[in-house]
Amino acid sequence: MANTPSAKKAVRKIERRTAVNKSRRSQMRTYVRKVEEAIASGDREAATQALRAAEPLVMRAAQKGIVHKNTASRKVSRLSARVSSLGS
């Protein structure tokens, strides 16, 4: 239990940041899922569009500290490799 005013404020700040981070992480996962669904359907055009939308969100999540930068780079790299391997 937080006793000092500064500790109480820190708890409030952490709750706000946790909510923001949850939202960003959820949004990132949604966009990545859209890319994976487009890849599964075999639609190269839709997969490319979805990847273009997802990449900035994934990298921004890394920049904000929601995921590690190597994790974000790995996700983008693997998704782009799968998109480019789709038949044209």
Curated annotation (Swiss-Prot):
InterPro entries documented for this protein: Ribosomal_bS20, Ribosomal_bS20_sf
Secretion signal, residue range per the UniProt entry: none
Gene Ontology molecular-function annotations: small ribosomal subunit rRNA binding; structural constituent of ribosome
Keyword Hydrolase on entry: no
Single GO biological process annotation from the record: translation
UniProt xrefs under Pfam families: Ribosomal_S20p
Keywords associated with the record: Ribonucleoprotein, Ribosomal protein, RNA-binding, rRNA-binding
Keyword Mitochondrion applies: no
Domain of life, per lineage: Bacteria
GO CC aspect terms: cytosol; small ribosomal subunit
Coiled coil: none
Sequence similarity: Belongs to the bacterial ribosomal protein bS20 family.
NCBIfam families to which the protein is assigned, alphabetical: S20
Function as written in the Swiss-Prot or TrEMBL entry: Binds directly to 16S ribosomal RNA.
Annotated protein name in UniProt: Small ribosomal subunit protein bS20
Organism this protein belongs to: Methylocella silvestris (strain DSM 15510 / CIP 108128 / LMG 27833 / NCIMB 13906 / BL2)
This protein's encoding gene: rpsT
